[in-house]
Amino acid sequence: MKRLSWDIELRCSQCGAPISLEETDRLLICSYCHVKLYLWTPSQFCYCLPALKASSENLIFIPYWRFKGVAYSVIPFEVRHRILDATRLAYSHRVLPVTLGIRPQALKMRFASGEIQGTFIKPQMSLQEAVMRIQNQFEELEGVLLSRPPFHREFIGELGSLIFFPVFIRNRAVVDGILGKVIGPEKDLVIDEAPSGMPDHWQIKPLSTLCPNCGNTLQGGRESLLLFCTVCHVAWNPSSGSLVASKFKVIPGKGDSPVYLPFWMMRVAVKGIELKSYADLARAANLPKMIQSEWEGQEVYFWVPAFRVHPSLFLRLSKQMTLFQPVEEMEAVLPNALLYPVTLSEESATASLKIHLAHLLTKKRDYFPKLDEIIIESAETTLVFIPFISTGSELVHPRLGIGLQRQTLSL
C-alpha cells in the first residue's frame, strides 16, 4: 500500500555520509560504504525538527506525539474504519498549537540524539491517551449521528513516535526556533521537570544485520519487523534490541510462485461465544456448506495479514483466509523467491482479533451488543508464508480463490 511519509535525515555511523530515510524505514543501507544496519529503540523513535537558531540560542524542545494507524469501530451493524494520521501536543501548557500542521512534511527531521544540545521536555501524556482523545472527538460525532456509542473500537497503530519542536527564550518571550517569531510570553513555558539532555531510552541503537549463526547478510524490506537468513533458514526478530530467532512456516509453492505473502496464523481461545471448532466457525459465519462431522474436532485458527494494506483489504483477506482454514503441509525452509516483508507486528494482529471476529459474524444484531462480553485471545501464533502467483495486475492463490491487486502492495 503506497503511503505518504515524512523524511528523516541522518549520517552513516560508519562513513559519515548523509542518508535520507522515510519515517517508517527500519533498515538502513548506506549508498557510499554499503553498510546495512537495523534501527532499534527501547521505547519509541524520537525526532527533532530543525532549528534555524540552533547555533546561537539555548534551545528548548517541546514534545508532540505523532501517530498513524487505523481506528476500527463496530457500529449497528457493520465494521467501519477511519485512517488516523495526526500529531498532538504532549505538553500541558498551551504555548504552542495543538498540532504541528504541515511542518514535518515541509522540513527534514533528524533523529533525536545526545549530539543535539538543549533542554528536552518530557511528554505529559502517553501515546495511548493522545490517540484516545482523537478517537473520542470522532466518536462523539458518530455517537450523535448514530444515537449510541460503538459496540467496540480498536486502534491498530502503524507507528507512534515523538517529535520535538524547538523554541527558545528571548526578551522574556517564547520564540519559534524554526521561524524566529514570538509565540507567547516566557511565563507560559514551564520546564522545571524537564531533563537537561536527551534520555538514553529515547535514542536509537543500530543493530548488525549479519546472521548470528552463519554470518550471512540478513534479508528484509525497508520497513521489515523481521529479518531472514536464506542460508540457515532462520527468522530473526530485532524487537528486543538483539536478534532473537522466531518461528515461521512456509506453505511450499507449486510451479511459479513469484511472491510469498506473510500471515499470522493464530490459534484462538474464545469466551462468550461458542467458537471451539471449525464447525462452530462455519455456523457463526453461516458458510454455504454442509457441516462435516470432522469439523467438530477441528481447531479454529484466525489468519491475519502480517503486512500493512488498506483497512478494507485487511479485513477481507483475514476473513477469506480464516473461513478457508488452509491445511496444507508446511515446512520451515525459506523458498528461493520473493518474501514480502513482515510489517504488521504480532501484537497488532492480536489486538485486531475481535474486529475480525465481528466482521465475519453473520448474525450481527445478535452478537454485536454482546461484544464487550466476548473475549478472544491468541493461544499460539505462527508466522506463515503463503505462495501467490502473478496473473497480470493481480496476485492470486488459485486453490484458495484469493486475489489482490499488485498495486496494493509495494512490489
Which functions belong to the PLM regions below?
Residues K2-Q14, P18-L21, D25-L411:
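Long C-terminal interaction/binding lobes of large macromolecular proteins
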